[in-house]
Amino acid sequence: MNTSEKKTGSCGKSGTSLDRREFMKAGASGALAMMCGASFAGTPGAAGTDLMTQYSEVIIDAMRDIVKDERANILKAADLLSDNANEGRLIHVYGAGGHSAIAAMEIFWRAGGLACVNGMFPVGTNVMTAGPTTAKVEGFAPYIFSFYDVNKGDTLILVNFYGLNITAVDMALEAKKRGVKLITINAQKFAKKVPKSFKWRHSSKLDINDLADIAIDNHVPYPDAILKVKGLKEEITPTATILTCFTINCLMSETIRMMVEKGGKPEIWVSNNIPNCDEHNKPIHDKYRHRVHHLYPVW
């Protein structure tokens, strides 16, 4: 698509025409607003490219906003995590509710990632193993903390796309009780839009960032899905997974950099699909296997 192409009205603003350059300069929030009144006409003969272009523009703008607006808190969190890791502590990560576990998985036992990450994936609290109610019942947090051996002085990265999931808030409250430092990653503006009376909120009516020592915003827009299709009432195509994974990878990148700058020697996984991977990964795996629950035996 070249810069002279226009967007034509589709979502209730018939006749709207916006230059692509104007769209690109609008930032994430402006782009979202524009998309409600216009869609890209696309390159002639390239059927189906309109929504791909819209989606990429919004995601890229949001990523830039994360780097700009969350920089201070990401660096503050990385400073804390790098100290913990250099002291020999594990970095605990829990993705609470639905698909939020994906972001926790993104930094656990992952190529280019730290070996000292303790991924917490209890049965019943994510989309793969949850029953109809288990992820929405209060009272699981103490058992999760004990099972994964999260102790006073440790740090927990608590990920919940929107920040109001019942299990997530339960985990945040338990962290405060146990003297565990809490880093949260969630969509803070999204959480504010959800009424306190919403039936799937925690009884405390809190969001996880209300309890955080360091709160990082993943800049997920409300209501997560962002694209419009003419003739369809619902928005389509979510943003939460890609933006949250980007955010947590920014955090871990800075953590590893700071570990090295402070004189540490971070142990980094390499891909299990490249030559000599076993020679590199097996000694690291052997070191952490009895401390990290989900490092199951592979050799």
Where are these regions (language model features)?
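N-terminal export leaders
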Residues: 20-33
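N-terminal secretory signal peptides
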Residues: 1-18, 36
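A short, well-structured juxtamembrane/interface segment
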Residues: 69-84
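C-terminal segment of N-terminal export signals and the immediately downstream linker at the start
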Residues: 16, 38-61
